Amino acid sequence: MQTTEQSKTLAKNYNAVKENIKKACEQAGRSQEEVTLLAVSKTKPVDMLMDVYHAGARDFGENKVQELVDKIPQLPSDIRWHLIGHLQRNKVKYIVDKVYLIHSVDSLRLAEEISREAVKKQVEVNILIEVNVAQEESKFGTTTEETEKLVRDISLLPGVHIKGLMTIAPFVEDPEENRTYFRKLRQLAVDIGNKNIDNVSMSILSMGMTGDYTVAVQEGSAIVRVGTGIFGERDYSKTI
């Protein structure tokens, strides 16, 4: 179990991030209520998640399906679980009825599998389209040029609802370097939103991580994905 000291540290970290979000919202003329702080809890033990839960977090993000499925029954039922990592089609069936939002849909084939499982389990699944705005070869995501067509194709599938876009910006020393990518994603969402496509909302932009979330908030992010800023450095040994 974590010590009380560690519980205090996690609560302090969580509240510091919330305060930074509040300030970024004020700078951008936004309400703090417009931004969800997603606690990225991958590789972290359940008791650390409970500490952050007690600090006020209700949205938690996991990268791996197995870890997500393992953690859900051990934690309070009012948590909203987000899958933010790359999703393989053969793992879809394990999570469609368990997650609040899938951030990482980047192909029609994946969306079709989500649709099949959603219909089978009689659930409605909310998704974001992952866009590789920075065109990094190491990252998943569709291109900005192909996003609208993908959105149109997925919008026709039963049981799947597009709620917006997600991007993973490059890891940079200066968060200002990523402002242009956040701006591009927001503009892409505006452009697609203006097309008024049935079964498509562009209300959620999932962008910004520990190193650059304040800039992302200033540029219109609705969900910031913060792991290290809350939990500290990840311990990858837990995943082996």
What do these predicted regions represent?
Residues 221-239:
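Gly/Pro- and small hydrophobic-enriched strand-loop and loop-to-helix capping segments
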